[in-house]
Amino acid sequence: MLTQVSATQADSNQASQASQALLDTLYQGHALTRSQSETLFASIVAGDMDPVAMAGMLVALKMRGETTAEITGAADALRSAAKPFPRSADSISTGVLDIVGTGGDGFNTINISTTAAFVAAAAGAKVAKHGNRGVSSKSGSSDLLTHCGIGLTMSPKAASACLDTLGLSFLFAPHYHEGVRHAVPVRQALKTRTIFNILGPLINPAKPEFMLLGVYSPKLLAPIVNVLNALGVKRAMVVYGSGLDEVALHGDTQVAELNNGDIRFYHLTPEELGVERADLNLLTGGEPSDNALITKAILQGKGEAAQRDAVAINAGCALYISGISDSVQAGTKLALATLKTGKAFDVLTQLAEASQTEAQG
């Protein structure tokens, strides 16, 4: 027994020394490799890193600027530690889509990407929406869904079944990434953005092949699209919409598009997508209960024109990326047509019923 304890202690000491050596590398201003970054972040989510050391590490990364390899390694660690999400042969064959943003853009808009997820699902995509509570807005994706009667803690097996039957499942981040809680006190104490602010969209347990990913700064377009490529994502659009982490209705959208290893950068305008541009004020959101009413109205084809179009252009780009449509313009047309049918609202009500049935069972 003593021998076992001694061996465990020795292993722990070796791991601690290895982590300290990597931290020293960071403090000297050097970048980490992907595997080195994975090692440090695995220590964080396992609860093994001292909070002071963690704070120093996060600040060192922030001050130098995180590299693609460091972000990818961090994502590797969090994905490996996540609760597994089972994928059926059907969803593996067709591929899975996520429509997600980093948050933190500073605008309190309606829940565009979450509402767009219902539209994309109704139009034929398989959407595994990974989300959390609000960061920069009053209403994050999970806040909205709760007010739509959709449970957040559906088992992975049940969520996977919804993905197959309804074309949509919602994966509540804290339900799958319990180890991230170890970083919360340090992040709160630092009161500044760190690498964790961009990791959320990169650690979907469903490991989607297709992604529409909004970022809060144009400086993130190139790093994030390269991370998605390194993580094995097949097709993606990383977008920055004139201040929003969405495809913009009020201005131009900068795009970094990934297509099976090839990356290109370009701009999109609302007019190119087939809609009229509209003032950002028309997309202002409210409390989760308010946003839930807005989402339900949009999905029933009753929303205000600007709200409808903002959702349609995001759903349209997602439909293009997932291969349902052959262009962003065709995707937007399909999204607008889908909204008129009310099928997207049917997906919402069916997902709510499924989550409530599981909760009662």
UniProtKB/Swiss-Prot annotation:
<comment type="function">
    <text>Catalyzes the transfer of the phosphoribosyl group of 5-phosphorylribose-1-pyrophosphate (PRPP) to anthranilate to yield N-(5'-phosphoribosyl)-anthranilate (PRA).</text>
</comment>
<feature type="binding site">
    <location>
        <position position="109"/>
    </location>
    <ligand>
        <name>5-phospho-alpha-D-ribose 1-diphosphate</name>
    </ligand>
</feature>
<dbReference type="GO" id="GO:0005829">
    <property type="term" value="C:cytosol"/>
</dbReference>
<keyword id="KW-0460">Magnesium</keyword>
<feature type="binding site">
    <location>
        <position position="187"/>
    </location>
    <ligand>
        <name>anthranilate 2</name>
    </ligand>
</feature>
<keyword id="KW-0057">Aromatic amino acid biosynthesis</keyword>
<comment type="subunit">
    <text>Homodimer.</text>
</comment>
<dbReference type="Pfam" id="PF00591">
    <property type="entry name" value="Glycos_transf_3"/>
</dbReference>
<dbReference type="InterPro" id="IPR017459">
    <property type="entry name" value="Glycosyl_Trfase_fam3_N_dom"/>
</dbReference>
<dbReference type="GO" id="GO:0000287">
    <property type="term" value="F:magnesium ion binding"/>
</dbReference>
<comment type="similarity">
    <text>Belongs to the anthranilate phosphoribosyltransferase family.</text>
</comment>
<dbReference type="GO" id="GO:0000162">
    <property type="term" value="P:L-tryptophan biosynthetic process"/>
</dbReference>
<feature type="binding site">
    <location>
        <position position="101"/>
    </location>
    <ligand>
        <name>5-phospho-alpha-D-ribose 1-diphosphate</name>
    </ligand>
</feature>
<feature type="binding site">
    <location>
        <begin position="129"/>
        <end position="137"/>
    </location>
    <ligand>
        <name>5-phospho-alpha-D-ribose 1-diphosphate</name>
    </ligand>
</feature>
<keyword id="KW-0328">Glycosyltransferase</keyword>
<feature type="binding site">
    <location>
        <begin position="111"/>
        <end position="114"/>
    </location>
    <ligand>
        <name>5-phospho-alpha-D-ribose 1-diphosphate</name>
    </ligand>
</feature>
<keyword id="KW-0822">Tryptophan biosynthesis</keyword>
<dbReference type="InterPro" id="IPR005940">
    <property type="entry name" value="Anthranilate_Pribosyl_Tfrase"/>
</dbReference>
<feature type="binding site">
    <location>
        <position position="101"/>
    </location>
    <ligand>
        <name>anthranilate 1</name>
    </ligand>
</feature>
<dbReference type="InterPro" id="IPR000312">
    <property type="entry name" value="Glycosyl_Trfase_fam3"/>
</dbReference>
<feature type="binding site">
    <location>
        <position position="245"/>
    </location>
    <ligand>
        <name>Mg(2+) 2</name>
    </ligand>
</feature>
<keyword id="KW-0028">Amino-acid biosynthesis</keyword>
<keyword id="KW-0808">Transferase</keyword>
<feature type="binding site">
    <location>
        <position position="246"/>
    </location>
    <ligand>
        <name>Mg(2+) 1</name>
    </ligand>
</feature>
<feature type="binding site">
    <location>
        <position position="132"/>
    </location>
    <ligand>
        <name>anthranilate 1</name>
    </ligand>
</feature>
<protein>
    <recommendedName>
        <fullName>Anthranilate phosphoribosyltransferase</fullName>
        <ecNumber>2.4.2.18</ecNumber>
    </recommendedName>
</protein>
<keyword id="KW-0479">Metal-binding</keyword>
<dbReference type="Pfam" id="PF02885">
    <property type="entry name" value="Glycos_trans_3N"/>
</dbReference>
<dbReference type="GO" id="GO:0004048">
    <property type="term" value="F:anthranilate phosphoribosyltransferase activity"/>
</dbReference>
<feature type="binding site">
    <location>
        <position position="246"/>
    </location>
    <ligand>
        <name>Mg(2+) 2</name>
    </ligand>
</feature>
<comment type="pathway">
    <text>Amino-acid biosynthesis; L-tryptophan biosynthesis; L-tryptophan from chorismate: step 2/5.</text>
</comment>
<feature type="binding site">
    <location>
        <position position="113"/>
    </location>
    <ligand>
        <name>Mg(2+) 1</name>
    </ligand>
</feature>
<dbReference type="InterPro" id="IPR035902">
    <property type="entry name" value="Nuc_phospho_transferase"/>
</dbReference>
<feature type="binding site">
    <location>
        <position position="141"/>
    </location>
    <ligand>
        <name>5-phospho-alpha-D-ribose 1-diphosphate</name>
    </ligand>
</feature>
<dbReference type="InterPro" id="IPR036320">
    <property type="entry name" value="Glycosyl_Trfase_fam3_N_dom_sf"/>
</dbReference>
<feature type="binding site">
    <location>
        <begin position="104"/>
        <end position="105"/>
    </location>
    <ligand>
        <name>5-phospho-alpha-D-ribose 1-diphosphate</name>
    </ligand>
</feature>
